[in-house]
């Protein structure tokens, strides 16, 4: 697989995980992320800043700087992309608000997900169809703890949630990393 294809695949994975994370953006926390596709990782969030780690790449989203950094630890290099403020998925929202494009949210039942008392909803988004979302109702953890396809073909969930504020250094480019550019990607914005 070419380097560019690999980068685009990783960017796609990180973006899909970011959509899952945005509902908890008002909180400071860290958690393990588990996905049905095996792209497991770690998320750190504080004041709208998001760091997502997978086995291949680290993504740091900085709304305050309107940037996304994609770090490749293996090569100590990073890509920098503009964060598009007009894109609705980049706007932080508490979990009790509608998702971008959401047209319906129906309460299904109360159940426990990974030890968190949660309310299960069927959420319909205009161009993406419907999925299930579990919102924790535990005090202090008002966030989406799991999302899943109606047909169970995919799912993402947070486990081992810690409400400790992450180290601010996690939201910066580590020392020793070199900025790289990729032709054709300079105008892309998330």
Language-model-detected regions and their locations in the chain:
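N-terminal secretory signal peptides that target proteins for export/translocation
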Residues: 1-5
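Non-transmembrane domains of secretory- and envelope-associated proteins
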Residues: 101-104, 109-119, 127-132, 137-190
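N-terminal mature ectodomain segment of secretory-pathway/periplasmic proteins
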Residues: 24-74, 107-112, 117-120, 124-132, ...
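Sequence-pattern detector for short linear motifs
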Residues: 8-9, 123, 182
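An acidic-aromatic
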Residues: 39-93, 141-160
């Amino acid at each position: 697989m070419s380097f560019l294809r690999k980068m685009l695949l990783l960017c796609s994975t990180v973006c899909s995980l970011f959509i899952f994370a945005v509902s908890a953006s008002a909180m400071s926390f860290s958690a393990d992320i588990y996905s049905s596709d095996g792209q497991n990782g770690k998320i750190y969030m504080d004041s709208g800043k998001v760091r997502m780690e997978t086995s291949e790449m680290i993504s740091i989203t900085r709304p305050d700087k309107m940037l996304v950094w994609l770090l490749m630890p293996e090569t100590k290099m990073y890509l920098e992309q503009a964060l598009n403020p007009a894109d609705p998925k980049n706007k932080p929202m508490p979990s009790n608000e509608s998702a971008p494009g959401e047209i319906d949210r129906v309460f299904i039942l109360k159940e426990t997900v990974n030890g968190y008392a949660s309310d299960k909803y069927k959420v319909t988004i205009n161009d993406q169809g419907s999925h299930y979302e579990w919102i924790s109702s535990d005090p202090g953890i008002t966030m989406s703890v799991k999302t899943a396809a109606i047909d169970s073909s995919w799912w993402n969930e947070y486990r081992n949630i810690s409400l400790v504020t992450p180290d601010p250094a996690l939201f910066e480019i580590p020392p020793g990393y070199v900025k790289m550019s990729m032709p054709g990607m300079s105008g892309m914005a998330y």
